[in-house]
């Protein structure tokens, strides 16, 4: 029974850590973090209360490891570089210089997966970290994801509308291809040579002579020499064609 009572605090620390450790401070203060109930601490882990204030994502991240040389190993990209140091040869007790955004829970992990936790509240973080315009570009992912989602929804809606209209409209008949008449090569027509009109009275073309009807009375009568006026005498006409 006495052994069980001695092991009870260790079992509770493994199950839920050290629930009584809580620290408050202002930016610029120095606070001490200690491992309570952990026999062989090997690393420290930090879960920020306002990760956007530091440009981080939610979740735990390691901030310190124990090493065989006695000098703790600090990750190069952790937010406590230059402000966190060990107070003993191990990593059981740490000193932290507070800064805005350091609020969160610090976990001290043991070799047998036991842990203790210390909750840190930095005064002013609730107001400072919720102010508009957080640093380190943390606002961009928060705006980019909704915009991408809205664009995806609009694109899918447009595709659905086009598909629905395409199904409702009757299919259009296929127009026949235009037909072209074969090209026939025609020879140019030669100009018709006009015949020259015949000139009446051309004796060379028409050797025959046609005589008009003569005055038979004048021909049947012998011509008399008369002293009468020549105008009174009968006239003989000849028509040459």
From Swiss-Prot:
Signal peptide extent:
1-17
Q: Which domain of life is it from?
A: Eukaryota
Give the protein's biological function: Inhibitory receptor that acts as a critical regulator of hematopoietic lineage differentiation, megakaryocyte function and platelet production. Inhibits platelet aggregation and activation by agonists such as ADP and collagen-related peptide. This regulation of megakaryocate function as well as platelet production ann activation is done through the inhibition (via the 2 ITIM motifs) of the receptors CLEC1B and GP6:FcRgamma signaling. Appears to operate in a calcium-independent manner.
Motif residue range(s): ITIM motif: 209-214, 235-240
Tell me the classification of the organism that encodes this protein.
Eukaryota, Metazoa, Chordata, Craniata, Vertebrata
Q: What is the effect of changing residue 211 to F?
A: Loss of tyrosine phosphorylation and loss of interaction with PTPN6 and PTPN11
Q: Which GO terms describe its biological process?
A: blood coagulation; erythrocyte differentiation; integrin-mediated signaling pathway; megakaryocyte development; megakaryocyte differentiation; negative regulation of signal transduction; platelet formation
The residue spans the entry assigns to the Extracellular side of the membrane are as follows: 18-142
Please give the name of this protein: Megakaryocyte and platelet inhibitory receptor G6b
A Pfam match = G6B
- The PTM Phosphotyrosine maps to 211
């Amino acid at each position: 029974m006495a052994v069980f009572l001695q092991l009870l605090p260790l079992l509770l620390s493994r199950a839920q850590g050290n629930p009584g450790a809580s620290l408050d401070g202002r930016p610029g203060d120095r606070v001490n973090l200690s491992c309570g109930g952990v026999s062989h601490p090997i690393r420290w882990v930090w879960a920020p209360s306002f990760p956007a204030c530091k440009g981080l994502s939610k979740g735990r991240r390691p901030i310190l490891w124990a090493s065989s040389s006695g000098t703790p190993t600090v990750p190069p990209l952790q937010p406590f570089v230059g402000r966190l140091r060990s107070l003993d040869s191990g990593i059981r007790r740490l000193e932290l210089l507070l800064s805005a955004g350091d609020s969160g829970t610090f976990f001290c992990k043991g070799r047998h997966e036991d842990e203790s936790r210390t909750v840190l509240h930095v005064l002013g973080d609730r107001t400072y970290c919720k102010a508009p315009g957080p640093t380190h570009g943390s606002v961009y992912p928060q705006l980019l994801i909704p915009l991408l989602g809205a664009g995806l929804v609009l694109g899918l809606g447009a595709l659905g509308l086009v598909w629905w209209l395409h199904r409702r409209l009757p299919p259009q008949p296929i127009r026949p291809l235009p037909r072209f008449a074969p090209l026939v090569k025609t020879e140019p027509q030669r100009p018709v040579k006009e015949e020259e009109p015949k000139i009446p009275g051309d004796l060379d073309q028409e050797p025959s002579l046609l005589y008009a009807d003569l005055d038979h009375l004048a021909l049947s009568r012998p011509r008399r020499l008369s002293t009468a006026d020549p105008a009174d005498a009968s006239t003989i006409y000849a028509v040459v064609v």
